[in-house]
Curated annotation (Swiss-Prot):
Organism per entry: Ceratitis capitata
InterPro entries: Cecropin (IPR000875), Cecropin_insect (IPR020400)
Keyword Cell membrane: no
Protein name per Swiss-Prot or TrEMBL: Cecropin-1
Record key words, sorted: Amidation, Antibiotic, Antimicrobial, Immunity, Innate immunity, Secreted, Signal
Record's signal peptide: 1-21
GO biological process, one term: antibacterial humoral response
Family the UniProt entry places it in: Belongs to the cecropin family.
Subcellular location: Secreted
Arginine amide carried by residues: 62
Amino acid sequence: MNFNKVFILVAIVIAIFAGQTEAGWLKKIGKKIERVGQHTRDATIQTIAVAQQAANVAATARG
C-alpha cells in the first residue's frame, strides 16, 4: 500500500514538471521503466522454468 502512494506521488510530480518540458525527457524515463518491466518479466519466466524443473527432479527422486 505504501508503494502505491509513493508511486502516485511520483507520477503526479512528473506530470506537473513534464507539462511544459519537451517530450523527449519523459519518453526516456518511460523507456527505462518499460525496460525494467521487460527484465522483470523475463526473470520471472526463467524462475518459473527453474522451479518447474526442480519440482520434476523432486518428483522423480521420490519415485
